Amino acid sequence: MALTTAEQEYLRSQPLGRLATVGTDGVVQVNPVGFHVRADGSFVIGGLDLARTRKYRNVARTGRAALVVDDLVSRDPWMVRGIEVRGRAEVATTESPAYPGASPDVIVLHSDTVFTWGVEPGAGGMTRRDQAS
């Protein structure tokens, strides 16, 4: 799913997100991860020895994941902003790891649903967009 200009700019300003996957026992696992967004709106998640991690195995098994990227803009007044992406996920290999020493193994998240709050100028509350079927 294509991201808006405001969403792209926001994501470029944030170094970390939290990836949620579901384990074999049905329990949700959430981990901080580095990411970058491709031109097509998919998210590439990398790391050290990624193929050895539970999140990688969870994605390989279920083909689903969610990523939240958010921050606290101000405490007074209270202002938060963020993006949650839910969708299809796959394990893959890249020829150009995200940073020196990173594994060539990656998780690619293709968004089916995007929630945003505080990112789009003038949009109050949370907004939701779903991939057209």
Per-segment meaning from a language model:
Residues 1-18:
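Short, basic/aromatic recognition patches
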Residues 15-49:
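Short beta-strand segments
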Residues 18, 86-88, 110:
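Residues located in well-ordered beta-strands
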Residues 41-42, 64, 88, 113:
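Structural motif
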Residues 44-46, 67-69, 116:
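Short hydrophobic/aromatic-rich beta-strand segments that constitute the beta-sheet cores
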Residues 49-105:
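Short, structured beta-strand-loop surface elements
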Residues 93-133:
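C-terminal edge-of-domain segments
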